[in-house]
Amino acid sequence: MEDVHWTSCTAGRNALGIEADGTIKGCPSLATATYAGGNIRDMTLEDIWLLTPELAFARTKTRDELWGFCRTCYYADECRAGCSWTAHCTLGRRGNNPFCYYRVIELRKKGVRERLEPREQAPNLPYDFGRFEIVKEPLP
């Protein structure tokens, strides 16, 4: 069991989100405006899966697309910053997961913790989210 660990965002790898109007995205949680790959009424599911970058991003993501703590993390090549929705809806872009347990453990070893401070309110749209900023501070 010790070898078990997270293996990256499953959006467009082994998950799909299908909205009521036929819009396809890699995960039901992802924002439609940014992550819609197409509509099942206009394209085949196979074409949406294979040809659209909105669904392919999790299959093709590398360490080079990561930023912040996640880019330098020991698990970066496997985890690739974990859940894309978590980072995107919190920090405005994917590639740096502020809710990672390993991250907390490693920062604690350095006597540091992180907290999120709100920077922008959610715009009151479907699948909306506000913006936060990571603030590092010494452990109390």
What is each residue range found by the language model?
Residues 55-58, 97-140:
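Short Fe-S-cluster ligation motifs
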Residues 14, 42-45, 105:
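Short capping/connector residues at structural and topological boundaries
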Residues 9-13:
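Short, small/polar residue-rich loop motifs at catalytic or cofactor-binding pockets
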Residues 18-19:
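Short, acidic, Ser/Thr-enriched surface-loop or helix-capping motifs
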Residues 64-110:
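Cysteine-cluster motifs in flexible loop/terminal segments that predominantly coordinate metals
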